[in-house]
Amino acid sequence: MSHGLSPRPATAKKSADLKGTVRIPGDKSISHRSFMFGGLASGETRITGLLEGEDVINTGKAMQAMGAKIRKEGDTWIINGVGNGALLAPEAPLDFGNAGTGCRLTMGLVGVYDFDSTFIGDASLTKRPMGRVLDPLREMGVQVKSAEGDRLPVTLRGPKTPNPITYRVPMASAQVKSAVLLAGLNTPGITTVIEPVMTRDHTEKMLQGFGANLSVETDTAGVRTIRLEGRGKLTGQVIDVPGDPSSTAFPLVAALLVPGSDVTILNVLMNPTRTGLILTLQEMGANIEVMNPRLAGGEDVADLRVRYSELKGVTVPEERAPSMIDEYPVLAVAAAFAEGATVMNGLDELRVKESDRLSAVADGLKLNGVDCDEGEASLVVRGRPGGKGLGNAAGGQVKTHLDHRIAMSFLVLGLASEHPVTVDDATMIATSFPEFMDLMTGLGATIE
C-alpha cells in the first residue's frame, strides 16, 4: 500500500448547513517549486503558507540530499540554497513517495548534472509513466536507466555539457514543460519550450521572480513559446504561498450542495490557469462571490464566499480541461446533484493520474446510485437534485485506489446524499490536504 499504513475507511453522512470561514493549505504546485527554487538559488529563501503534505516534504528532502539547507522556525521555512549549477550528487536514491510533480520536476532539475541520480517512489508512483519527461532529457544528452515502460526506479546521468533544445510539448502537461525548463537552468545557451495549449504557469512566473532570464511569447493561435537562458544566477526570495485551488474545491463544492450553507474560503490562488472549476460551477448556477481580489508574489489571490445553490447540468468546453484536470472528480460529484446532464470531454489525462481517475470516479458514482456513462476520454453525469436515493445504504465502499482526490470527492458526495457514502481508505488524504477532516467537520460536516 502507499504508506505502509493500514487502510482506514471513512463515511460521510447527510449534513445540516455548513457555516464558517476557513483558510486552505498552501498551493501544492507553488509549494513544490518554492522548495526547489529556494534550494537552488543563492542566498536565503523564506516561505510561509507552505503546504506541509507528504508530497511537498519529499521534495524538500530531495533538495536537502543535494546540498540545500532547510529548516523551520515557527511558521516560516528558511532555505539556504546551493546556487544555480551547484547541486551535489545525492548519496542515496531520492524517494518521492506519491508525488508525481516533485519526482518529474526534480528529474529535469538534476538530470542534466554530470553525476548519477536515482528516483524511487511508492506503489502508485511506480506505476506512473515517466517517459514524457525522460524523452526531452534524452534529447539534451541525459543517459536514462529505467524500469520497463520508462517507470521508476529511474537513474539519470547528465552529459559533460547538456545540449539546449527546442521542445514542443506533445500533451497539455505543466510537469513536462517545467521539467525541460528546469533542465535548461543548468544548460548553456537558450532552452526553448513550445506549448500548444496553455497549462499552469507557476514555473515561469516563479523563475522570473527568482531572477531567471526567461521570456514568454503567445501567438495569435494561443501557442506559447518560452525561452530560458541557462546558467544564470537565481537569488533567494520571500514567498507567501496562496491557498491551493484544487484543495479549495472540496469545501467549496460541499457548501454548494448542502442546503443552507454559507462558507468563506480565504486567500485562494486565482491564477487563470487554475480556475476552470470555479468558472464551470458558475455556469451551472453556483453562487460564488469573489471578494478582495489582489496580487501576491505575482499571483492572483482572492477570498471566496460560497452559498448553497441549485445547479443545472452543462457541457464543459474541452479546452478547459488543463485548467481543472485535478478537479473533475469533485465536479462530477457536483454534477450528481444538478438538474440535467453534465458532459465532460477531453479527459484522457485523468487515466494516468494517481489512479485511473476516470474509471475510479465512474465506478464510485455508480456504486452510490448516480446515473453516469464513462467513455474513452469522457464522462456524462445525469444529476438528481436534492440527492434523493444517492449514497449506499448497504455501506458499499468506494475504491479509492490510494488516490487522495477520489477519497475527498466521494466524502463530499455523502454530505448531501440521502444515504451515507463510504470510502475504503482515507489515509492518503494526508498527501495533499492533511487538515481536510478537521476543516470539514469544523464547518459542520458529518464524517467519521
Curated annotation (Swiss-Prot):
- Main subcellular localisation: cytoplasm
| One GO term of the biological process aspect | amino acid biosynthetic process
Under SUPFAM superfamilies, the record lists:
EPT/RTPC-like
Q: In which pathway does it act?
A: Metabolic intermediate biosynthesis; chorismate biosynthesis; chorismate from D-erythrose 4-phosphate and phosphoenolpyruvate: step 6/7
Gene3D superfamilies the record matches: Enolpyruvate transferase domain (3.65.10.10)
Give the UniProt keywords, A-Z.
Amino-acid biosynthesis, Aromatic amino acid biosynthesis, Cytoplasm, Transferase
**Which residues constitute the catalytic centre?**
326 (proton acceptor)
Give residues annotated as binding phosphoenolpyruvate: 28, 100, 128, 175, 357, 405
Q: Where does 3-phosphoshikimate bind?
A: 28-29, 33, 173, 175, 326, 353
Q: How does it assemble?
A: Monomer.
Under the heading PANTHER family, the entry gives: AROM/DEHYDROQUINATE SYNTHASE, PENTAFUNCTIONAL AROM POLYPEPTIDE
Could you identify this protein by its name? 3-phosphoshikimate 1-carboxyvinyltransferase
